[in-house]
Amino acid sequence: YKKLLANNIRIDMITSLDESAFLGSMQFDDESLSKISKDTIILSGNMTNEGVLKKFNQENLFLFELYKSFNKDNKYFTGYSIGEVTLDMLLDFKPKNIYLIGLDLALNQETGDSHAKDSDSITSSLNLDEEQSRDTFSHVDSVIKVKGNFRDFVFTTPLFYSSISSTNDKLSKKEKNINVYNLSSHGAYFENSIPIKKEEINTQDFKDINFNDINILPFLIKHSIKELSEESKKEIKNEITFLENDILKQLKEISKKDYKDFSFLFKDIIEIPLMINNSSYKSFFQILIGKLQIVIPYLFYHFNDIKVKNEEKKVKKIRDVFVKQITNLVNDYIICLKRVL
């Protein structure tokens, strides 16, 4: 947004979602915020650092929910970066045309930089000429080749690739009468988007928008709440009860059992995500599955070895570690739920 300010472009709305405290001094420093109009609306993710939120005009600050809705029947948004989360929101507003500027999700194809030098994001720089080895793969240092918006291909990072996949997923579900134009010269191509150069845009066709007549602020106020409804609080309390009475109880039962081999332990382990998935409380399911997808393949790989020794002893140790880790995970999640109440 600082680049817009530097070019005397009025900013009517800013979106943010990063939970990092350093944003208060890096992206939203006092000098830059002083240049923003008092009428600028801030849409900020509910995971944003509290210190950052306090710097905004509280009358124009609205929080949106990410990944899970604590407000019953509320809309939540998803994505790996503010870019595709904002796109997710814009698509929900159902505009006729969306123009993507700066959503490159690729490295600078000349310098290898992840972000513009004058941006306030943490910038990394990779050597695009270096031969890539697939013996090791890093989400920070590895480079991936993908289709470019205006080039045959561009280089990107694993983290950006996740955002590209997320963006493609959102655009695949957009309504057909919404046109999404991508102006990125260095960036990745997005499915269901239209590559366009700035010279090809006829700005004479654009209409002046009088935001005073649209009344965005009253609209947002009308469709916002300042606290959880009693029904939402009841849902959260019921989820806590389910986790305490069912999941923690199941973990305790596992801790008491003796397992001769890993296959029997696995049957009891997998029962836990099945219990959650069959309930009305799906959020913790994704957390648990993410954990198991990392761990379980390695355990199967080990115990499928016919030469494995002391299986019963190893399984006992795995049982104890699993119960301890998942119990801690459940308890931490319960603490987070109670904070919302």
Where are the regions that the model predicts?
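Acidic/Gly/His-enriched mid-domain segments of enzyme catalytic cores or analogous surface patches
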Residues: K2-K96, P297-L341
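Polyanion-binding loop/helix "lid" in catalytic or ligand-binding cores
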Residues: E131-G187
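Electropositive phosphate-/nucleotide-binding environments in soluble metabolic enzymes
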Residues: Y80, T157-S165, T241, D320, ...
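Active-site gating loop/helix substructures
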Residues: Q58-N74, A116-V154
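Acidic, Ser/Thr-rich peripheral helices and adjacent loops at domain boundaries
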Residues: T15-G24, F28-D39, H115-F137, E199-N210
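Long, compositionally biased charged/polar accessory segments in the mid-to-C-terminal portions
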Residues: L171-L341
